Amino acid sequence: MLQSWRQALWALLLLVSVAQAQFNFFDQMFGGGEQQRQQQRSQNSPSDSDRYQQMWNGAQCDHYLCPGTLACVHFPHHCPCPHPDVEEKVELGEGSAVCVSKGGFKAGEAARKIELARKGLL
């Protein structure tokens, strides 16, 4: 008799744990994890520019201070791209340059497409 009670209790515990796991899955699946997402959102940096302004004001540069990277360079078109792993710098002439997404293309492909677009061929 004790053996059957033990088996029944074991089966009940197993059933409860499976049900709990199932409800946790559905809770996460259908928005029950909203509280966790809100906590993650609240940890993001605010969108004001005070921190950037402080870094800009504290930067030491005798030449040109790049606005996107705060790098100190001799000329504006020498500014590096903020995300060199995924961006390619393309010099447009007249001392200007732009950073464009590489988009998975081989090196120089973005520059070629920009040049074609400037000529009206793309």
UniProtKB/Swiss-Prot annotation:
Q: Which GO terms describe its biological process?
A: ERAD pathway
Q: Which UniProt keywords apply?
A: Signal
Cystine pairings recorded for this chain: none
Secretion signal, residue range per the UniProt entry: 1-21
**Function comment:** Probable component of the endoplasmic reticulum-associated degradation (ERAD) pathway.
Family, as annotated: Belongs to the LCL2 family.
What name does this protein carry?
Long chronological lifespan protein 2
Report the gene name: lcl2
